[in-house]
């Protein structure tokens, strides 16, 4: 091959790399902070009888995927807290993420037994505000542990939320982010709509209204559902009344992949469905650099019954 051909080949090979460098450089000029890496994952509860896909047979694979991403924040759903260490998913995941703190409690009456919507955060970079953190229930009595209002709802649903202060070399930078993690109901459409409304009301009423928001969750409904459209700022009819969302979120995946059609996130340990029911939402002031549905397999098996999703966010 002649010198000119080699030069041409090198130019072609370098173009994608150069484009990525230019893109990241552009974001770094527009947004002063280091990007925020986020993962949302429904871990599939450890107490389920899943045969070959039982928790004991997939937990190492799943935590390998979580750890590999070097994430700032990880929102997990169906994360079991249990006195039995073999079933305690929060404890196991924590043991594999030594550099991360963890915040969350069970959605049931007992804070340490049941499924939790857990937030893992990188301790080197983030300090959780002890005065601005909460778990609330998606019910008419949000401060009552284990509460639910809709009789058609499958179980109590909760939201874990906290304000985080960014650190650099152990000192606050002055920059802050709110993080919310939830799991909407799988049985009742009305419960999902009420849950979405209550979540958006709480976000709009947060203490520091100028601080941007990240929301992770298994919403159990597709992109065109009333609950998701409401979270993105569209009106929703509930109780024969039209409600206007008090806050507007952006779907990070759609920001990065507006034309994607292969977007199913529930796989049932088999083949994925067509609907995207897992989300990472962000405030409009935050910009998505990249977002992905992680379909990694090991020996023909998935790490959980939902595909993990991640996003890299500029701020």
Predicted features along the sequence, with ranges:
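Active-site metal-binding loops of divalent metal-dependent hydrolases
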Residues: 42-43, 79, 182-184, 218-219, ...
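Active-site environment of divalent metal-dependent phosphoester hydrolases
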Residues: 46-47, 81-85, 112, 186-188, ...
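Sec-exported extracytoplasmic/periplasmic mature domains
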Residues: 67-71, 92-98, 125, 201-208, ...
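Active-site neighborhood of phospho(di)ester-bond hydrolases with catalytic His/Asp-centered motifs
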Residues: 75-77, 103-106, 214-218, 251-252
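Metal-dependent phosphoester-hydrolase catalytic domains
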Residues: 190, 194, 201-213, 221-315
């Amino acid at each position: 091959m002649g010198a000119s051909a080699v030069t041409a080949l090198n130019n072609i090979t370098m173009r994608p790399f150069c484009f990525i460098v230019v893109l990241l450089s552009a974001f770094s000029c527009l947004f002063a902070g280091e990007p925020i890496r986020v993962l949302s994952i429904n871990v599939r509860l450890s107490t389920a009888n899943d045969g070959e896909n039982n928790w004991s047979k997939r937990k190492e694979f799943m935590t390998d995927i979580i750890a590999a991403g070097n994430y700032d924040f990880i929102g997990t759903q169906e994360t079991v807290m249990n006195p039995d260490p073999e079933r305690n998913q929060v404890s196991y995941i924590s043991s594999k993420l030594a550099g991360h703190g963890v915040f969350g409690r069970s959605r049931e009456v007992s804070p340490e037994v049941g499924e939790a919507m857990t937030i893992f955060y990188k301790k080197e970079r983030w300090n959780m505000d002890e005065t601005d953190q909460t778990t609330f229930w998606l019910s008419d009595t949000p401060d009552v542990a284990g509460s639910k209002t809709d009789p058609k709802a499958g179980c109590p649903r909760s939201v874990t939320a906290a304000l985080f202060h960014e650190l650099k070399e152990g000192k606050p930078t002055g920059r802050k982010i709110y993080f919310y993690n939830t799991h909407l109901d799988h049985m009742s459409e009305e419960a999902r709509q009420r849950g979405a409304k209550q979540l958006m009301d709480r976000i709009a009423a947060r203490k520091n209204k100028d601080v941007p928001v990240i929301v992770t969750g298994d919403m159990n409904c597709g992109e065109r559902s009333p609950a998701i459209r409401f979270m993105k700022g569209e009106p929703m009819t509930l109780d024969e009344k039209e409600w206007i969302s008090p806050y507007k979120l952006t779907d990070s995946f759609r920001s990065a992949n507006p034309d994607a059609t292969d977007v199913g996130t529930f796989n049932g340990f088999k083949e994925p469905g067509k609907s995207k029911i897992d989300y990472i939402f962000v405030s409009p002031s935050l910009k998505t650099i990249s977002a992905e549905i992680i379909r990694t397999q090991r020996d023909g098996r998935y790490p959980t019954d939902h595909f993990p999703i991640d996003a890299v966010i500029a701020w």
